[in-house]
Regions:
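LRR flanking "cap" motifs
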Residues: 113-177
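Short proline/glycine-enriched turn/loop motifs at strand-loop junctions of beta-rich domains
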Residues: 55-60, 218, 261, 282, ...
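Extracytoplasmic soluble-region selector
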Residues: 24-110
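Bacterial N-terminal signal peptides that target proteins for export
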Residues: 2-12
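C-terminal motif of bacterial Sec signal peptides marking the signal peptidase cleavage site
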Residues: 19-22
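Canonical leucine-rich repeat
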Residues: 169-172, 191-194, 210-213, 234-235, ...
Length: 454
C-alpha cells in the first residue's frame, strides 16, 4: 500500500519538473514577437526606435529589412524617415526553434503633414474605417484623399468622452477632397489647417475657442456656420460667391460685407457687435436674424424674396421697409423707433412692442394676422383695414384711448390681450355679434371702457 501512495504522490512532482524543464530555454514559452506599435507616422528626417511588446532575449539574433528603402531605412531597429510614402519594416528571428516575423508600417508624411493630436486620426478611422485600405490602422496621404465628408461634432460638450475630444486639427489639411466638415463643440484653438481645404462646400466650426478663420480660398463654400466662437472678431466672405447660408451669431464680429453673396438665402448675426447692417441687391435672401446686436442703422434694398426680418433688441431709431413684397414676419421690438412706415402686402406677423411709437398706420397691411404692440406711447390703434387680424397684444400703454377692431370680420379664435396696464383706455370699436360679446366679457359694465358695436 505504501508503494502505491508513493507512486501517486510522485506524479504531480514529475509534471512540475517536466513543465519547468520545458521552459528553461532562452525565451519564455508565451513570448510574442511583435512591435509595440503596428503603425507609425513620421515626418521626413525624423527617426524612431522600434520596440517589441514582449520579452526578447538580448542573445536573440534579429535581422532587419525594409520594403521600400527610398521611403525609410532601418538599422538595428532604428528607423529613419527619408521620403514621403508608406513602407513596411520587418524584423525576423528564430525563437524556441520557430521562425517569427514582426511588422511595423511606417508612413512618411508630406512636408507639413502631422497629426498633433492622435485622437484626430483615431476618431476619423472610427467613423470611416473604409478609408484604411491597407488595414494598417493608420492614415496615409493617399487614404486621406478618399474622404469627402467628415462629421466630428460633439453632441453634448459637457459630456464629451476622451475619444471624442480633439484639441488640434493639424493634419486635416491632408484631406483635400473634403466637401463637408463639422467641428461643432470641439476643443480646438486653431483652425488654420482647415483653410487648406479648398473644396469645402459646408463648414461648421461652432462653439470652439478659435480666434479666426480665413475662407477666401474656398470658392465652393455654400454653408458657413461659425456661431458660438466668442473669440472671432472678423470674417471675410466677399470671395465666397456661392455662399447661401451664413451663421455667425454669438461672436465678436463687428462688420460683415455680403455685397458679393448673390446666392445668400439665410443670414444670422444675432448677438454680435454689429453696429450697422446693409443688405442690398440680394435676390435670394429669405431671412435675416440680427437680434441683440448694437445696430443703429439698417438698409434693406433689392430684397424681393425676403420673408423674415428679426432685428429686435438694438438701437434703431428708424428703419426703411419699402419694396419688400414677400415679407411675412417683421420683428423690431425693444428698439427706439418713433415712426414706422409699413406698406407690406404679405406681412402677417408684426412685433413692435417696447419702442417709442406715438402713432402707427396699419392700413397697408391687408394680411396682418398677429400684432404685438405693447409698451408704446400710442393714443389710438386702428385695425379697421385688417380683416384677418386674430391676435392682438396691446397692453401697458397708459396713453392709449381707443382701439378700433371694427373691420367687418371676426375670427372665433381671436385672442385680444388689450386690458392690462391700459389705464387710459376709453373705448373699443367692434363689429356687432360674436366680437361684441367677446369684448363685453373682457370689459364688463362699470369697467370704464365703452364697447361701441355696429
Amino acid at each position: 500500500m505504501n508503494k502505491i501512495i508513493k507512486s501517486i504522490l510522485s506524479i504531480p512532482f514529475a509534471l512540475v519538473v517536466l513543465l519547468t524543464s520545458s521552459c528553461l530555454k532562452p525565451e519564455p514559452c508565451n513570448s510574442k514577437f511583435q512591435f509595440e506599435q503596428e503603425s507609425i507616422t513620421l515626418k521626413r528626417g525624423e527617426q524612431v526606435t522600434l520596440k517589441f511588446s514582449g520579452y526578447i532575449s538580448k542573445k536573440t539574433q534579429i535581422s532587419w529589412s525594409v520594403e521600400k528603402p527610398n521611403v525609410a531605412s532601418v538599422d538595428n531597429g532604428l528607423v529613419r524617415a527619408l521620403n514621403a510614402g508608406t513602407t513596411n519594416v520587418y524584423a525576423e528571428a528564430t525563437i524556441n526553434g520557430i521562425k517569427k516575423t514582426a511588422l511595423c508600417t511606417i508612413t512618411v508624411a508630406p512636408e507639413g503633414f502631422r497629426f498633433t493630436d492622435p485622437n484626430l486620426p483615431k476618431r476619423i478611422l472610427q467613423l470611416h474605417p473604409e478609408i484604411d485600405t491597407n488595414k494598417d490602422g493608420a492614415i496615409t496621404p493617399e487614404e486621406a484623399l478618399l474622404l469627402t465628408e467628415l462629421d466630428l461634432e460633439i453632441k453634448d460638450k459637457a459630456k464629451a468622452t476622451a475619444e471624442e475630444k480633439i484639441t488640434s486639427v493639424e493634419g486635416i489639411e491632408l484631406f483635400t477632397n473634403l466637401t463637408y466638415l463639422n467641428l461643432k463643440n470641439q476643443f480646438i484653438k486653431d483652425a488654420t489647417p482647415v483653410e487648406a481645404l479648398k473644396k469645402l462646400e459646408k463648414l461648421y466650426i461652432t462653439y470652439t475657442e478659435i480666434p479666426s478663420i480665413q475662407v477666401k480660398e474656398m470658392p465652393e463654400l455654400r454653408d458657413l456656420r461659425l456661431f458660438g466662437n466668442k473669440n472671432i472678431k472678423e470674417i471675410d466672405v466677399r470671395s465666397n460667391t456661392k455662399l447661401d447660408t451664413l451663421y455667425i451669431q454669438d461672436t465678436q464680429i463687428s462688420e460683415i460685407d455680403v455685397t458679393n453673396n448673390k446666392e445668400l438665402i439665410a443670414l444670422n448675426v444675432n448677438r454680435t457687435n454689429l453696429t450697422r447692417l446693409i443688405l442690398a441687391d440680394l435676390p435670394k435672401l429669405n431671412q435675416v436674424l440680427a437680434v441683440k446686436c448694437q445696430i443703429s442703422s439698417v438698409s434693406f434694398k433689392g430684397l424681393p424674396a425676403i420673408k423674415k426680418i428679426y432685428i429686435d433688441n438694438n438701437q434703431l431709431t428708424r428703419v426703411n421697409l419699402k419694396d419688400l413684397p414677400a415679407l411675412m414676419h417683421l420683428s423690431v421690438y425693444n428698439n427706439k423707433l418713433q415712426t414706422l412706415e409699413l406698406d407690406l402686402p404679405k406681412l402677417m406677423f408684426l412685433h413692435t412692442h417696447e419702442n417709442e411709437l406715438k402713432s402707427i398706420d396699419l392700413s397697408k397691411l391687408p394680411m396682418l394676422f398677429h400684432l404685438d404692440i405693447d409698451k408704446n406711447p400710442l393714443v389710438k390703434i386702428d385695425l379697421s383695414s385688417n380683416k384677418i387680424i386674430r391676435d392682438l397684444r396691446s397692453e401697458y400703454i397708459p396713453t392709449l384711448e381707443e382701439i378700433n377692431l371694427r373691420n367687418g370680420e371676426y375670427n372665433e379664435d381671436a385672442q385680444y390681450e388689450i386690458k392690462e396696464g391700459n389705464t387710459g383706455l376709453k373705448r373699443v370699436l367692434v363689429d356687432s355679434g360674436d366680437e361684441e360679446t367677446h369684448l363685453r366679457n373682457l370689459f364688463p359694465a362699470g369697467s370704464g371702457v365703452a364697447i361701441l358695436a355696429e
